[in-house]
C-alpha cells in the first residue's frame, strides 16, 4: 500500500490531537508514559466538545464523560492498560480527577491545567 502526498490546501483537511509540550519537557511529568500523555491529549480534545455543549459543573468547571471502553478504543489497547493510563494521569501526574456518580454509572472526569510554574 502506498500513500499519496499532500497537495496545496489538503494539509488543512485533517484534525489532530494536541498534546501539550510541557508534558514532555517538564520533569514533573517524566514519570508518566507517552501513552498516558497521548490519552491526556485525547481528553483535552473531548473537553473542548464538552465546553461547547455546556457540560459545566456547579463550580463552573468543564467535565467530560470518558469511559474505559472509550479509552480502549481510542488507543487500541486492552482494558487493563486503559485503566493503568487513566490511573497514571490521575494519581501520578494529577492531571485528571474522576468522580463516580453512583453504582453502575459513568464517572465525570475533570481535567486539570497542565501548566506549571517555571
Cite the ranges covered by each PLM segment:
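Short recognition helix of helix-turn-helix/winged-helix DNA-binding domains
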Residues: 1-69
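Extended hydrophobic/Leu-rich segments
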Residues: 13-14, 106, 110
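Winged helix-turn-helix DNA-binding recognition segment
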Residues: 46-108
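Single conserved hydrophobic/aromatic residue that forms the stacking wall/gate
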Residues: 110-113, 117-118
Amino acid at each position: 500500500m502506498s500513500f499519496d502526498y499532500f497537495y496545496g490546501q489538503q494539509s488543512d483537511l485533517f484534525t489532530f490531537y494536541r498534546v501539550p509540550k510541557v508534558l514532555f519537557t517538564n520533569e514533573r511529568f517524566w514519570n508518566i508514559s507517552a501513552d498516558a500523555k497521548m490519552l491526556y491529549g485525547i481528553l483535552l480534545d473531548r473537553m473542548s466538545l464538552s465546553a461547547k455543549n455546556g457540560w459545566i459543573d456547579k463550580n463552573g468547571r468543564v467535565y467530560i464523560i470518558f469511559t474505559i471502553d472509550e479509552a480502549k478504543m481510542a488507543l487500541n489497547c486492552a482494558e487493563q492498560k486503559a485503566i493503568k493510563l487513566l490511573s497514571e494521569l490521575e494519581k501520578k501526574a494529577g492531571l485528571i480527577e474522576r468522580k463516580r456518580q453512583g453504582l453502575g454509572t459513568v464517572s465525570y472526569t475533570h481535567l486539570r491545567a497542565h501548566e506549571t510554574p517555571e
